[in-house]
A protein has these predicted regions:
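Serine-hydrolase catalytic machinery in alpha/beta-hydrolase-like enzymes
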Residues: 9-93
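Conserved loop-alpha-helix segment in the C-terminal half of the alpha/beta-hydrolase fold
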Residues: 158-178
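Primarily recognizes the serine-hydrolase "nucleophile elbow" in alpha/beta-hydrolase
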Residues: 83-147
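Acidic catalytic loop of the alpha/beta-hydrolase fold
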Residues: 132, 158-163, 188-189
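Catalytic histidine-centered segment of alpha/beta-hydrolase-like enzymes
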Residues: 71, 186-198
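The conserved beta1-alpha1 loop
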Residues: 27-33, 127, 156, 184
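Short beta-strand/loop motif that positions the catalytic acidic residue
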Residues: 147-149, 154-156, 160
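Catalytic histidine neighborhood in serine/cysteine hydrolases
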Residues: 173-189
Length: 211
C-alpha cells in the first residue's frame, strides 16, 4: 500500500489487521536507512505480529528515500512528516487509540513528532540513541519532554551501546508517565530477544486501550 505526506512524498507501507475488529491502531518506525534500516527488520516484524494479535491495526512503513518510498532522506528532520502521515493513515483503520512505536533512528523521529501530535495516545521508544548520535537530530530537552502527557515506554537491550541503561533511566525521569524495560542478554538489535521485546511493547500498547 502507499500513502502520501503533507509535502507530497509517496511512502511505501504495509498494513497488518487483526483477525477481529481492531481495538486501536499502531504505527511502526524503523531504524536509520543509511545503516540498513527498513520496515522489514526482524524486531519490527515481531512487534507488528504481537500488536496485531492484541487487536491493533498496525502500519509499518519505509521512511522517505528508503526502499520503494519516494523522496530523499532528510536526516531525521523531514521524516516527522512521514510519521504524521502514517498516523493519519493508520487511524482510518480503527476508532481506538493510536500507539506509535519507534526503533533507533525511528524512535528519535517518533519522539519528536509525538511531542507535536495530540493524536498519539502512547509512545514506545526502543533503543532511542543517546550515545553516538552525530547523524540524527538531538533528543528534545527535559523541559520539552515534561510537556508530553501520554505514557512512554523506553526499552533497550542490556548491552545497547547507543542507549545505555543509565542514560535511558535518566531520560525517563524527564517524562510525566514513563516505563522502562531493559532486556537482558542482548544489544541494540535485540537479537534472539525479539519476541520478549515485542511482548513488552504489546503489553504496554494494550494498556493504552483502557486509558
Amino acid at each position: 500500500m502507499r500513502f502520501t505526506t503533507e509535502d507530497g512524498v509517496s511512502l511505501e507501507g504495509e498494513l497488518r489487521r487483526p483477525e477481529s475488529n481492531p481495538r486501536g491502531s499502531a504505527v511502526i518506525c524503523h531504524a536509520h536507512p543509511r545503516h540498513g534500516g527498513s520496515k522489514d527488520h526482524p524486531i519490527l516484524w515481531a512487534i507488528r505480529n504481537e500488536l496485531a494479535q492484541r487487536g491493533f491495526a498496525v502500519l509499518a512503513f519505509n521512511f522517505r528515500g528508503t526502499m520503494r518510498s519516494g523522496g530523499t532522506h532528510g536526516g531525521g528532520r523531514s521524516e516527522t512528516k512521514d510519521v504524521s502521515a502514517a498516523v493519519g493513515r493508520a487511524r482510518l483503520e480503527a476508532d481506538g487509540p493510536t500507539v506509535v512505536v519507534g526503533w533507533s533512528f525511528g524512535a528519535n523521529v517518533a519522539l519528536r513528532e509525538a511531542l507535536e501530535d495530540d493524536r498519539v495516545a502512547a509512545l514506545a521508544l526502543i533503543g532511542l540513541p543517546l550515545e553516538h548520535t552525530l547523524d540524527i537530530p538531538d533528543v528534545p530537552s527535559p523541559a520539552e519532554l515534561r510537556l508530553f502527557r501520554p505514557p512512554v515506554l523506553l526499552l533497550a537491550g542490556e548491552q545497547d551501546e547507543y542507549a545505555p541503561e543509565p542514560l535511558v533511566r535518566e531520560l525517563a525521569s524527564a517524562f510525566r508517565n514513563p516505563e522502562v524495560a531493559i532486556v537482558a542478554g542482548t544489544d541494540h538489535y535485540l537479537w534472539r530477544r525479539e519476541r520478549e521485546a515485542a511482548a513488552i511493547v504489546g503489553s504496554f500498547a494494550e494498556g493504552s486501550l483502557g486509558r
